[in-house]
Amino acid sequence: MRNWEDPFTLACNTALKKNLPSCIFIIIFISVLCPVAMSQVVVPDSDADCLLRFKDTLANGSEFRSWDPLSSPCQGNTANWFGVLCSNYVWGLQLEGMGLTGKLNLDPLVPMKNLRTISFMNNNFNGPMPQVKRFTSLKSLYLSNNRFSGEIPADAFLGMPLLKKILLANNAFRGTIPSSLASLPMLLELRLNGNQFQGQIPSFQQKDLKLASFENNDLDGPIPESLRNMDPGSFAGNKGLCDAPLSPCSSSSPGVPVVPVSPVDPKSTSPPTGKKAGSFYTLAIILIVIGIILVIIALVFCFVQSRRRNFLSAYPSSAGKERIESYNYHQSTNKNNKPAESVNHTRRGSMPDPGGRLLFVRDDIQRFDLQDLLRASAEVLGSGTFGASYKAAISSGQTLVVKRYKHMNNVGRDEFHEHMRRLGRLNHPNILPLVAYYYRREEKLLVTEFMPNSSLASHLHANNSAGLDWITRLKIIKGVAKGLSYLFDELPTLTIPHGHMKSSNIVLDDSFEPLLTDYALRPMMSSEHAHNFMTAYKSPEYRPSKGQIITKKTDVWCFGVLILEVLTGRFPENYLTQGYDSNMSLVTWVNDMVKEKKTGDVFDKEMKGKKNCKAEMINLLKIGLRCCEEEEERRMDMREVVEMVEMLREGESEDDFGSMDHRGTHNNVYSSMLLDDDDFGFSMNR
């Protein structure tokens, strides 16, 4: 029997047989001239090449198993590689909390001209701060909570005109604060707290600077006048600092030096000129194009082969070979027309050992088995603190989401099965139903339906998002409120019925109706993982050292933060910290803006359809702040929240809008359900 040959090999062999001398000449010609051409015309590295070279610099780069050289980091807006942020190209790198060690070398990433965000927070990198000023298009740099040390050069941030957010907190940096920080024209947020910076604070003149944190350093001298409206807590822990908002300086204190910032002196290189150079470039480009075409043919073949792999390749082979049986609450039939296992709702005692089988909790969906998932075309949707999510399109036409959990080891097998059965009984238009699950001691799979409009977070925070108008945002908030209230009613024995409420755990269907995901999983999660990562444990009441624990009102607090996130378009950065940090709280920022009578600046500038809706937007903002009271007993009950949110309207008529006073309160009976303006800034005044 003739051995099969791939088309690329067959074509080459045929060409060689027909015209061997010509082929040899072409090969020699290309092999000689291509290196010369490439030395003159540099082809930019691909994002994948840059990322792979960067991975090789990491001491524990072996953890990046999804960074496959045979696959692309991005497929449209979906990331195939862990920690990569995509918008048809790689625009961000988010490798947080991975225990990465050693020195951080960012040089391999410099050719990635579309890179806008770099985040390595909560790792164990040490050594000096990496060089970043060659990333001239960078907008955000997050390096907090590592072990970086040493002085940061004064010009470390020169030539970075787009840089808006810099987080260097909780490292061991020393020396003076680099003067180039003061020259960043678009700086919005700067966090230098928890280091060993010395000397005086430079004069920051940026008008849009909203937050600057210098606490717990060794700084001295007067606080620059441009920063004297900041929260006093931003300067705490520096014994030598003085002047507003701290105590006045003594008469002998020197003035604040204005540190001159040298302009960037870009180096320019003159391109080769003349007819000879032009002809050589033309020939080089032609040869490169020919080579690229040949490479593309080979890559297409490799890509087709790589598509056969999928997200379950990391599972032991035995798992893929097991026969999957349906485990449902009603009698059903499997592929062999034999009755599948059926379990009575009221049965107590030990559940039968599923033996590693896929178990269905719904009977209104077409059955599939693990082999269908193994053969499915899978895409990586993302990787969060709970686990990785995959989109799987199986042969029957169903599109599913499979999520792998590695920290669901808080209960035994029987308790886990019982809880999954309980979740399978939930039925509400704003709850994403569980379809099936797979149990192993080491990790679990939860299978749900795929929602076409991605998560709420992607619409609020992705660079390529068109944004959501007011009507859609209000619709989403109303749906989330009803879904959360349903969980409160159906899961009364759970301390926190949801426990992980945030915008990335809310998906949107084709009509932008919201559905809650990752709900009611706290009983299954390991305590350490839950305390470190679940949003409920970032609430102000969670202070185990003081005996304060979470309650059902904690979910109300999370919902309030979500309301503020939807209205402001700002990401709640306290989710990135462990525990509650009022300095990083979105609630604190909103209250500060209200106290300064800048309520109009709170709302997302990207939100459309705001005309004649200001009253309703302010009313929703008040509801959000009521939900976010630091004292639990002052927060609203969930049913009260739903009632108030349901009363909000999409817009006001001209008459209604004209009947409002300048503070945004109605003069009709509707306002009796809401706060008056004296209560609007409650957390600042009480």
Swiss-Prot record:
Topological domains annotated Extracellular: 40-283
GO CC terms of this entry: plasma membrane
First-listed, main subcellular location of the protein, grouped into a coarse class: membrane
Cytoplasmic side: 305-686
Recorded catalytic activity of this chain's protein: L-seryl-[protein] + ATP = O-phospho-L-seryl-[protein] + ADP + H(+); L-threonyl-[protein] + ATP = O-phospho-L-threonyl-[protein] + ADP + H(+)
Record PTM Phosphoserine, positions in chain: 377, 455, 458, 545
Tissues showing expression: Expressed in pollen and/or in flowers. Detected at low levels in leaves.
Cited Pfam families: LRR_8 (PF13855), LRRNT_2 (PF08263), PK_Tyr_Ser-Thr (PF07714)
Superkingdom, taxonomy of origin: Eukaryota
Membrane topology note: Single-pass type I membrane protein
Repeat (LRR) residue spans along the chain: 112-135, 136-159, 161-184, 185-208, 210-230
Annotated Protein kinase domain residues: 375-648
Keyword check for NADP: no
Residues binding ATP: 381-389, 403
Residues carrying a glycan: 60
EC number(s) given by UniProt: 2.7.11.1
Signal peptide range: 1-39
Entry's Gene Ontology BP terms: regulation of pollen tube growth
Keyword vocabulary terms for this entry: ATP-binding, Cell membrane, Glycoprotein, Kinase, Leucine-rich repeat, Membrane, Nucleotide-binding, Phosphoprotein, Receptor, Repeat, Serine/threonine-protein kinase, Signal, Transferase, Transmembrane, Transmembrane helix
GO MF annotation: an example: ATP binding
Disruption phenotype: No effect on pollen germination and growth. Prk2 and prk5 double mutant has no effect on pollen germination and growth. Prk1, prk2 and prk5 triple mutant shows reduced pollen tube elongation.
Phosphotyrosine: residues bearing it: 542
InterPro entries (UniProt xref): Kinase-like_dom_sf, Leu-rich_rpt, LRR_dom_sf, LRR_N_plant-typ, PRK1-6/SRF4-like, Prot_kinase_dom, Ser-Thr/Tyr_kinase_cat_dom
Job description of the protein: Receptor-like kinase involved in the control of pollen germination and pollen tube polar growth. The extracellular domain serves as a sensor for peptides derived from GRI. May act as a downstream element for ROS-dependent cell death induced by GRI.
Record-stated family: Belongs to the protein kinase superfamily. Ser/Thr protein kinase family.
Name used for this protein in its record: Pollen receptor-like kinase 5
Source organism (scientific name): Arabidopsis thaliana (Mouse-ear cress)
Gene: PRK5
